[in-house]
Structure formats: C-alpha cells, structure tokens
Amino acid sequence: MERRYVPVADVARPHGVQGELRLRLYNEASDLLLTRPPIRLRLPDGSARDAKIVATRPVDKALLVRIAGIDDRDAAEALRGATVCVPRDAFAPLSEGEFYACDVEGARVMTPDGDLLGHVRSLQSYPTCDVLVVERQGADSIEVPLTESFVSSVDAERQVVQLATLEGLV
C-alpha cells in the first residue's frame, strides 16, 4: 500500500544564503516537523520529490528548516511555493473519538434520515468552533458546526459524518 502524504506547510521563501527555508506552517502549534519526519515536496510545477529535513529551528510564527542537498540560496529559491507533505503515519496517535482534519476530508455527510447530503471538503477553525465545509451536489457548499447539536458522530475510519439535525443548515 502506498504511503499517504498530508500537506502540513508551504515553503514561504529562502532564508539566508546557505539554503535554509522558511516554512509557513498550517498548524503553528504542531511540533511534527521538529521530529524531522521524511517529507515529500510538491513543487509548483506539479512534480514531487522526497526529501530529508536535517535541521529545524522555530522563529516567530514560522519554522526554518535545512533540507539535505539544498545548500545555497538558488537551490532554496527553486523550492519557493512548494507544499511540504508528511506521511500520515508520522502523525501522533489519537485518543478514542479524536481525528485529524485530513482524516475526514472526502467523508460522506449523512442527514438524520440517512440520506447523503454531500462530502466534507475541508475543516475550518473559527474562534467559536470548528466547522466542516460540506460540498453538495448541485447546490452551494454549507458549513456545519462541529458540535454535538449538529453532528452526532464522526467515523473517520469509515469516512462517514452523521448529522444530528439539518435545522439552520439548509
């Protein structure tokens, strides 16, 4: 089975002249890249290449990294705009009932009556709560608050989100 890679950061720009890269992390609280997992770089031209992080250091709201074989500013500049992806199996294990956003993307969203409402396009974090952005066939997307009032269960393994109600959503 092929490894599944999950985007965790973008290469914002080179840093200095020795090939260091400044990453814009999708989750600033995550320390996943500090553990130097294997990474896959998805380049702006659509190609991808595997890479190895050899050094990291947090700075401001970003992370500076050195990647094996990237030894000067020109080589670093060639990676500007690349997406940094990490194998899903490198993520920390979760407790019962917890899931990572990447694990529910594409999941079927079922109405309380058992009908298919749509599929999860993404998970957005807002100050008051997280919401599932649900893409519906032939209709506008909707945002479903990820609260017990609206979502009765999330089965990331089976890729099913069961809604408790449609009231206020459609």
Swiss-Prot record:
GO BP of this protein: ribosomal small subunit biogenesis; rRNA processing
Superkingdom: Bacteria
Keyword Cytoplasm: yes
Quaternary structure, from the entry: Binds ribosomal protein uS19.
Compartments, record wording: Cytoplasm
Summary of the function given for this chain in its UniProt record: An accessory protein needed during the final step in the assembly of 30S ribosomal subunit, possibly for assembly of the head region. Essential for efficient processing of 16S rRNA. May be needed both before and after RbfA during the maturation of 16S rRNA. It has affinity for free ribosomal 30S subunits but not for 70S ribosomes.
Any one of the GO CC terms: ribosome
Keyword Secreted assigned: no
Comment block on domains: The PRC barrel domain binds ribosomal protein uS19.
Stretches assigned to the PRC barrel domain: 96-169
Protein name: Ribosome maturation factor RimM
Organism of this sequence: Sorangium cellulosum (strain So ce56)
GO MF annotation, one: ribosome binding
Keywords: Chaperone, Cytoplasm, Ribosome biogenesis, rRNA processing
Family to which the UniProt record says this protein belongs: Belongs to the RimM family.
